[in-house]
Regions:
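Accessory alpha-helical/coil subdomains and C-terminal extensions
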Residues: 50, 56, 60, 78-100, ...
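Ankyrin repeat structural motif
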Residues: 459-467, 492-501, 525-534, 558-566, ...
């Protein structure tokens, strides 16, 4: 796992090792590299000023440029160079002023009137691929590259050809488990650098969404709409509105301003860190039912090595009920352990077993896929089948469960879920409001205040009530604090747990760039720090800045602060600009408690500062010989 950023200069150096078996032998091995932009600037201690976005360019129309013959082609190592020439995609004056003029500064979007400026890095794969040539191994490579630098960036953008974009978006949504940051996939019908271009808007919009909005999902941004990735499908070969989400409205619409439907965001609710599941089962398929299809065709399709299949049926999931031969083939397949999922051939709507013909499929052991798109159903099946620790029944249950917002599961509503908050009802009556729109406006005004008050009062029952009335768990107050910031500051572990279980983001930053983890660390709430780290929170300071705060804590004899940083995953051996570590500082001031703790934590004892002093030398110079002896005993 990456612990520091100081030595990172390319993704090739920091990506995790790829020891995963090849899924598809026709897959073309790829190399990921950057052209000019170095990751060294990530060590800047003042990174709270900007959001950081990594752009991964896989190929496709969006990045094509005209070659010597005037034809559009994917030319390697040209994308970033060309972006730097466009002032609406790169603010060169800001980048030079902020990062210097050494030629490898990050790209920076012009001011978009968002909370923070967005700096971004472009890395591209070699070879660049037409998306028709994408394989499951490419999905795995993208997922693992994101994992390798996950803690360095606030969001990710994947540039992709449109033909298989929906498959990639769906696959990544399942593979990226407990995702806490935005991953936005985009492409275009016209390249970025053409005079008329949807690619330019799609690119800029994607970088803004990844860097400025707390939407921890794999999404698709296209034609000014942000869709849930596993709900999308390509609907046109020639229109700029090439993608749609047939059974779910967009998560965000970019007009004059960007309107986000925060209530629809599918957030992780498990107290677990982000991980990548890097196995997929390619022995899956799509079988579209048509009139007079032969039982032999279906039988051959379901022969080994097939492990699962999506059956695309008529209407609301119907099959010809008089075709007992086909039903018998399906029944035999499910008895052999093949997982079959029933989805509709229609663009809109869902599978329902209200008809006799649909019920017959259920009796044959076929699972209802509800309103999943073919892309989502297929990639979900590939993901589920690859889970070797799940038995057959568990895999079937998981296919029927809404894992990443890919399907609409209609359940019984909780009793009282839609009841109005008592205070909203009281005020509405007092103001004699009769319009539902007026009541909704009152609710929008009051709910944030009520929510923050309940957090402050540690009132879980009230939080449940307000949440059931549509409160957004990641609401921000005027200082940019979320409810999780507030609970982390107060050290209320019970409330922190509740917020995390209801989708609170551990990565939200306030106006000073501080995360809830940083707030908890600075207040030495160790239990809260543990909870946040367990859920994927990580420190965002550069090693140099971390060295400064650790040295300050040790110099102040603040062992609790050192413990807080240790629990948060900090490298306690980080040095400040003078080369001093926390152990140097503790030995200088004579803090035996800090020295003992740092030694137990494994901090090196031989590090020399800029004056060539080791921690033991610092102890001796300041007449703390007992500390020097402690260090000698440790070295022995």
């Amino acid at each position: 796992m990456i612990r520091t950023l100081s030595s990172a200069s390319s993704l090739d150096e920091i990506s995790v090792s790829y020891d995963v078996p090849v899924v598809d032998p026709t897959s073309v091995p790829k190399v990921l590299y950057g052209h000019r932009t170095s990751l060294d600037s990530l060590c800047d201690p003042e990174w709270s000023q900007e959001s950081r976005v990594l752009v991964l360019y896989t190929g496709g129309t969006i990045g094509m440029v005209r070659n010597d013959r005037g034809k559009l082609a994917p030319i390697p190592r040209e994308l970033e160079t060309n972006i730097r020439r466009y002032p609406h995609m790169h603010d060169d004056s800001y980048a030079t002023k902020r990062f210097g003029c050494n030629g490898n500064t990050p790209l920076v979007l012009p001011d978009c009137k968002e909370k923070r400026r967005v700096a971004y890095w472009v890395y591209e794969y070699e070879p660049l691929l037409d998306s028709s040539n994408m394989t499951m191994d490419d999905w795995i490579r993208i997922a693992k590259d994101i994992r390798g630098v996950y803690e360095m960036f606030d969001g990710f953008v994947v540039l992709h050809g449109t033909d298989t974009l929906a498959y990639t978006a769906s696959a990544l949504s399942f593979m990226l488990e407990n995702l806490g940051k935005p991953v936005v996939i985009t492409g275009s019908q016209i390249p970025i650098f053409e005079t008329r271009s949807d690619g330019r808007d799609n690119f800029i919009g994607s970088v803004i969404m990844a860097g400025s909005y707390n939407i921890p999902e794999v999404t698709v941004f296209f034609n000014n709409k942000l869709y849930r990735g596993n709900r999308t499908t390509k609907v046109s070969t020639g229109r700029l509105q090439a993608f749609d989400s047939p059974n779910m409205p967009p998560l965000a619409i970019a007009g004059i301003s960007i309107q986000v439907d925060y209530r629809s965001i599918f957030r992780p609710t498990r107290l677990e860190k982000f991980t990548v599941f890097d196995r997929l089962n390619r022995h899956v398929g799509l079988l579209r039912i048509f009139p007079s299809i032969s039982a032999e065709t279906v039988k051959q399709f379901l022969q080994p090595p097939i492990s699962g299949a999506i059956i695309q049926t008529y209407g609301a999931g119907n099959m010809p009920s008089n075709r007992t031969d086909i039903m018998e083939v399906l029944r035999d397949a499910t008895k052999r352990g093949v997982i079959l999922v029933n989805t509709t051939q229609c663009m809109h709507g869902a599978v329902d077993t209200i008809y006799e013909t649909g019920e017959a499929l259920v009796s044959a052991g076929v699972i209802a896929g509800l309103d999943m798109t073919p892309e989502a159903a297929l990639t979900k099946l590939s993901y589920v089948l690859a889970k070797s620790d799940w038995d057959y029944d568990t895999k079937k249950r998981m296919m029927m469960r809404n894992l990443r917002g890919e399907m609409t599961v209609v359940g019984q509503e909780d009793e009282g879920e839609n009841q109005e908050l008592d205070v909203v009802s009281a005020i509405s009556r007092a103001l004699q409001l009769s319009s539902s729109d007026d009541v909704e406006r009152i609710r929008d005004l009051l709910v944030p205040t009520l929510f923050f008050t309940a957090v402050s009062n540690c009132d879980i029952k009230r939080l449940e009530e307000i949440f059931s009335n549509g409160a957004e768990v990641n609401l921000l107050d005027v200082s940019g604090w979320s409810a999780l910031h507030m609970a982390a500051c107060d050290g209320i572990a019970e409330v922190v747990t509740w917020l995390l279980q209801h989708g609170a983001s551990v990565h939200v930053r306030d106006k000073q760039g501080q995360t809830p983890l940083k707030i908890a660390v600075e207040n030495d709430h160790h239990k809260v720090v543990e909870l946040l780290v367990q859920t994927g929170a990580h420190l965002t300071e550069s090693p140099l800045r971390l060295g400064e705060v650790l040295v300050s804590a040790a110099a102040a004899d603040n062992v609790e602060r050192l413990k807080s940083y240790h629990i948060a995953g900090a490298d306690l051996s980080c040095a400040d600009p003078c080369g001093r570590t926390a152990l140097h500082a503790a030995c200088t001031v004579g803090s035996e408690e800090c020295v003992r703790f740092l030694l137990e934590a494994g901090v090196p004892t031989t590090t020399r500062d800029r004056t060539d002093l080791t921690p033991a030398m610092c102890a001796q110079v300041n007449n703390h010989d007992h500390l020097a002896r402690l260090i000698d005993e440790q070295e022995e």
